[in-house]
């Protein structure tokens, strides 16, 4: 009996020393986010946003009865930009924000959150950045994802297993891939690429009104006469499998002068011949001169020797996220 009493006393002492956190808000009143990634504006396909990544978001407030399209100039700042992260069962900010009766919220968001240090901003006009240069060391191969504007929201919404503000991210740059392989009818034993370059395009521009129907890349700057993508005197040996060079580019319409140039060596029966340089123009030869927002443009070359040494074609598709997380966050 004495042992049992001591046990009860110990338990009571433990409970008296234990701090019990009381949640003083209802889960449905918290502003949360329902996050997915869309491949591009041209498709409805979506993939889950990786829970290990974070993004930035801002919200603007209007009175009920006012719509964002008609009254956005009357909106007031509610919060942000703040970092949104996965909290175990939901997406939200460290500082909690709540839905208010008689008010609506409109949201702008971009990912990844690290872009905040590279000049991305949010205003009632949307997401923007000035003078984004894809050749700058700090920005090269970086991706910009912007969510569609979430207008006139009064509560969390359920979709794809989460509840919150619909936050659908899309790529806002353009992915340009160049694929090279040895032609089936090569006319040579081996093909070695010694140089590959592109030129006459812009690498710097301003992005405005991101997340809205009016978003665009403007003020194109820094025209590049030549960018060497690969150069090696020994050369890159081509095979039947494609060798792929991926590049992140400013969306733009190319000019008639925009080009791709390839130099290579062909080897036949131990005899080496220098081939090229061969210049192909994106508009004239590939018939593909538009690097649109959120697209993946692919230029394919099958290289050989002889009368018809290079077969080439181009294609443009939605920029589809890849990798185990379903989205490329660099």
Regions found by a protein language model. Name each.
Residues 268-330:
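Hydrophilic extracytoplasmic domains
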Residues 7-11:
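Sec-dependent N-terminal signal peptides
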């Amino acid at each position: 009996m004495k042992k049992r009493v001591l046990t009860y006393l110990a338990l009571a002492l433990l409970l008296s020393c234990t701090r019990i956190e009381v949640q003083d808000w209802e889960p449905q009143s918290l502003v949360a986010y329902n996050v997915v990634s869309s491949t591009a504006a041209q498709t409805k396909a979506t993939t889950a946003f990786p829970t290990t990544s974070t993004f930035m978001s801002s919200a603007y407030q209007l009175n009920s009865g006012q719509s964002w399209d008609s009254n956005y100039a009357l909106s007031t700042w509610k919060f942000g930009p703040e970092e949104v992260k996965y909290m175990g069962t939901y997406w939200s900010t460290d500082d909690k924000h709540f839905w208010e009766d008689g008010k609506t919220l409109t949201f702008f968001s971009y990912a990844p959150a690290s872009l905040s240090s590279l000049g991305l901003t949010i205003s009632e006009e949307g997401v923007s950045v000035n003078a984004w240069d894809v050749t700058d060391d700090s920005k090269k191969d970086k991706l910009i994802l912007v969510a569609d504007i979430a207008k006139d929201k009064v509560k969390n919404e359920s979709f794809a297993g989460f509840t919150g503000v619909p936050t659908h991210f899309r790529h806002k740059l353009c992915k340009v891939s160049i694929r090279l392989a040895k032609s089936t009818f090569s006319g040579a034993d081996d093909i070695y690429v010694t140089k590959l370059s592109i030129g006459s395009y812009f690498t710097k521009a301003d992005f405005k009104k991101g997340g809205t129907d009016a978003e665009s890349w403007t003020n194109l700057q820094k025209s590049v006469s030549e960018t060497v993508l690969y150069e090696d005197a020994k050369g890159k040996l081509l095979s039947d499998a494609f060798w792929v060079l991926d590049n992140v580019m400013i969306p733009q319409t190319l000019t008639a002068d925009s080009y791709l140039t390839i130099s290579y060596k062909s080897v036949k029966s131990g005899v080496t011949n220098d081939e090229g340089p061969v210049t192909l123009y994106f508009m004239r030869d590939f018939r593909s001169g538009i690097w649109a927002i959120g697209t993946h443009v692919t230029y394919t070359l099958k290289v050989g020797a002889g009368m018809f040494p290079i077969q080439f074609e181009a294609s443009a598709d939605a920029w589809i996220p890849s990798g185990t997380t379903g989205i490329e966050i660099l």
